[in-house]
Amino acid sequence: MSINHLLIVLGKRLNENKLTDEGISRVDALVGYLVELLVEESNQQTAVAFCGGVTKGQTLSEADAMHQYFRELEAQYEHPFKLGAILFEQRSTNTVENIQNLASEMIDSGLFTRGQSVKVTFISNDYHLQRIFEIQALMDEQGLLKVLIEKCSALGVELQIDRKLESHIPVPYPHQTTQGQLFLLMDVLTTYRVYLEGASAGAFQRDLDIVRKEPQRLSVEALVKAKELVGDSSLFGIVESLLPVLEHCIQQTPVDTDTKKVREYLALLDTNLTLLNRYLDPESDHTHRWWR
């Protein structure tokens, strides 16, 4: 019996080799989905892919940690889920690598045959999936889904990936604090970073004013909200000092900026977004040189 549905659980950085609240919520959502699916149909044509490698400071892969927790939850039910297959992508350290490496794992698994059509459902936290589909909609040239679809299509496997967020399994972000809100706002700027990456690489063969407009608008709105939040608190001095730097990166990269300058501001934006992502993530371990 061939696989016709692939559930992809995207990984989240571990803390002391343990799943964080985000990671736990993603596996909980997978199990909830499989339990409902069992009411309607067998899971034997469904495969699950756990994605995520070993990040710095850890010795366990995100994929392994999620799978272990998945088995713990499965054991609480009278019958196992009897999936068609479980795949592991354990070489990646970020979402881009998740998707790129997963395509290779799918092809190498031998589970998918030429001429086959496979429905794909992503499972992750809402902000994470929203960013993936937002980038795909605004800048298809830079989208991660395009890589996955094209790699599999080259071998005759057609992936059916709905571009609507609600067709997947977006799990509510678990941290409703000021820090959590700032983390989400900084994540919004990922879209502008991806725009700069595409612009510096010459990826866009269309009007750059149109390409840049929405990423720029989203980022400016996020920065305004972030300024309001840090202004109401004395706890985020580092964030407050870096917000003008991020704003400057956007202001100084209009569409007529030369490529060398775009790359310089991309480096500045990317470095500071990574720093703020790790600094603001409520699930980060800040005991060891976390900024590297």
Label every model-predicted segment:
Residues 2-292:
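A structural signal for short, hydrophobic/glycine-enriched beta-strand patches
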